[in-house]
Amino acid sequence: MQLKKKPVTGMKDILPQEMEIRDYVIGLIKETYKQFGFTSMEAPCVEHIENLTSKQGGDNEKLIFRILKRGEKLKISEAKEENDLVDSGLRYDLTVPLCRFYSNNANELPQPFKALHIGNVFRADRPQRGRFRQFMQCDIDILGEPTYLAEIELVLATTTLLGKLDFHNFTIRINDRKILKAMAQYSGFPAESFDTVFIILDKMDKIGLEGVSEELEKEGFARESIDTYLGMFREITSDIQGVRYIKEKLKDVLDPKVAEDLETIIASVDAVKSADFKISFDPTLVRGMSYYTGPIFEIAMDEFGGSVGGGGRYDEMIGKFTGQNTSACGFSIGFERIVMLLLERGYEVPGTGEKKAYLIEKNMPADKLLTILKQAEEERRNGTQVTISIMKKNKKFQKEQMMTEGYTEFVEFFRDKL
């Protein structure tokens, strides 16, 4: 039987040209985030199935790659349901593993803990542009910091990185889960229906206010509640004035500190930012994960046509491991989507230095080859990237191929002439 050469559906092979950009971006991520005090950590890509199915991951829990029990623990004939056959799965994000990691190692970590976590995650999703079943995710999280300083630092660190990658005119959309709930409560929606309301609200970009109105009506909600709810969205602006409007409008159902903190985050980021972007209050921003408890944010880029990153505060998640809540806030960038955008725009890694190719005639005597190897080693010590290859018959094609890899200078060595 002939083996299959193509990767499994939803996976991809990464060629050297893309790998060079990926390596550069990862290096820049580490360099930039460490300037903000984040430190690297790692957790296994395999997690307990109980942790992955704890109703914290939203729709991602439907996309888990489950791992069968092994050996004596695997009793297929006695299994009554799927979970009787599995005890672990591949992580679908980095947040659940981070919370388990922190819960297990908190006594050995600084407080607050500023974590940088880069690694592959896995989702049995439908592949599409910029979306794969295995993909790299890059998260920064601040654990143990209850104030809005965490949100400010996360937004500034992430936007500084994007600025270094020559991204401009993007938008950080920001909202707060408490504002979402207060708006729904003020409008008269029953608390048990909030999630349904938010799922419909999340479609605002695609179906508009009228579409949201129609879907809410189809769900059987009162017309008065729908009109009150959507009337606020017509009045709210995307700046600090919009936050102040919400603070006044919802004063009977919303702690004023929620709006005041959000205003401080927006004003602080605007005053300090170094990258070219705007931060915009967006009361329609929902974010799919149920574990968010406070401010939430998302990166919107017109050239991608959607989100390329996001995050928020999740103060109640670590408590599910320890029994005691710990303040936590994180921001994840869409690493694969950002690399895809860089490739599409023909991005070149800066400062790669000179790349030189030594082409050696076939059957070069050992003593002469040694001389060439010493010469190459000397150039490498001086900072030049040197590759050594045997000269092919079609030398022109060989050079053209190497030029696509960035080699700009070629040195030819022959047996009778060095």
Task: Describe the function of each predicted region.
Residues 132-138, 174-182:
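Short, conserved phosphate-binding/catalytic loop or strand-edge motifs used
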Residues 18-36, 47-48, 82-85, 93-107, ...:
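Positively charged, Gly/Ser-enriched RNA/tRNA-binding surfaces
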Residues 52-53, 181, 203, 398:
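Short Asp/Glu-rich motifs
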Residues 55-59, 186-188, 295, 402-404:
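Short low-complexity, flexible loop/linker segments enriched in glycine and/or proline
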Residues 1-92, 96, 152-156, 173:
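TRNA-binding/sensing appendages of the translation machinery
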Residues 60-76, 188-212:
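Acidic, His- and aromatic-enriched active-site or binding-groove loops in soluble protein domains
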Residues 169-178, 197, 280-286:
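Short, surface-exposed recognition loops or helix-turn segments adjacent to catalytic cores
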Residues 157-164, 178-186:
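Hydrophobic mid-domain F-helix/FG-region of cytochrome P450s
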